[in-house]
């Protein structure tokens, strides 16, 4: 079995870090044979057998760790877009995002914001701060 970091690398290396894939990863973990087929349908692409086996063999705790790693990677992407859009430093963008209601909702799984793509979250943040961009 591969480590959590190897699994995350496999996922990101295959450019699967998009809203639809994150929605599946964030869903409650149900080890079953149809998990692989659901994963393929959601991502619209086939994965190599090693990646599929690794995803299916995760414990619930490991599954949660993968979800959290992906969430933090997404925050980095969102912060870069905030910096570019508003013309502020990365540090300022990070500070702005972490102090926002949008960030709070992004971490709260009950709101469903984490299921949306990075640009959707960015637009929510920009609307929250009243940016005309």
Regions found by a protein language model. Give the residues of each.
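C-terminal alpha-helical interaction appendages
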Residues: 25, 35-133
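N-terminal cationic leader/targeting segments used for protein routing and processing
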Residues: 15-16, 41
